[in-house]
Amino acid sequence: CLEHCRNELETLERDIKKLENITLPFPRITYDDAVEILKNNNVDFEYGSDFGATDETIISNQYQKPVMVHRWPAESKAFYMKRDPKNSNLALGVDMIAPEGYGEIVGGGQREDDYKVLINRIKEHNLPIEHFKWYLDLRKFGSVPHSGFGLGIERTVAWISGTKHIRETIPYPRTMYRLEP
């Protein structure tokens, strides 16, 4: 980005030095490590919960670059997230938290590919199985190990460009008084 967009970022008055310090590899910490960071910062956090915006800011401030949080408690992730074969209480999921308080920009993980396990998980989550027929049909006759992720484009653009609010990166943002363009 800096090779191709330095002028644009300077026009936006982005502090380029903060982006120049972003180097690979990104730190990888477990969910438990992240909870420990919160506790060390006197945050009253309920284990098994997802992180809020303030929590993500505290975690990211420890690193000043994107940080990968993995090995989440399984109950905090979606039914389709595969469990860790070494510890079934953990999900094979990951979130990438951007620095400077921009929050989670990527969420992903390995997907459950076993049809029977998926049916049980849907039931465990008290979800109506008929709503997931199409999803189950994709795995009914066999599947392969696979993963997926979601990237928050607007939040990523907000972080890279240094904008104050995510709505500045959305062409037609929804607000309390405007729900359509």
Name each model-derived stretch.
Residues 72-77, 84-86, 101-104, 110-112, ...:
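Short, glycine-/Ser/Thr-/acidic-enriched flexible segments
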Residues 56, 95, 104, 154, ...:
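Acidic-residue sensor for enzyme active/binding pockets
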Residues 1-101, 124-144:
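Metal-assisted phosphate- and nucleotidyl-transfer catalytic regions
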Residues 109, 114-181:
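Active-site pocket scaffolds in enzymes
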